[in-house]
């Protein structure tokens, strides 16, 4: 039996990013509830905000230029754990504002 993927969200406690990390964890658990083994929050310092899936980096605040939108994060996680999965409205293009 293979184990389910595990997500770790490392967030800066000095920057008070716990609520942002918890919200993204909830978004991932809502979307991938049956596909993930665990989503954990790991306190850090020094402005860190990193999301990994089984040690594969999904998002890193400095490298990716800020924080992820939930839609983009879900797409990146999906691309790692189940690339063929349709995310429904999260995979639809957003119309450009005029």
PLM features: what roles do these ranges have?
Residues 1-98:
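Domain-level signature for proteins that mediate thiol-based redox and metal-cofactor handling
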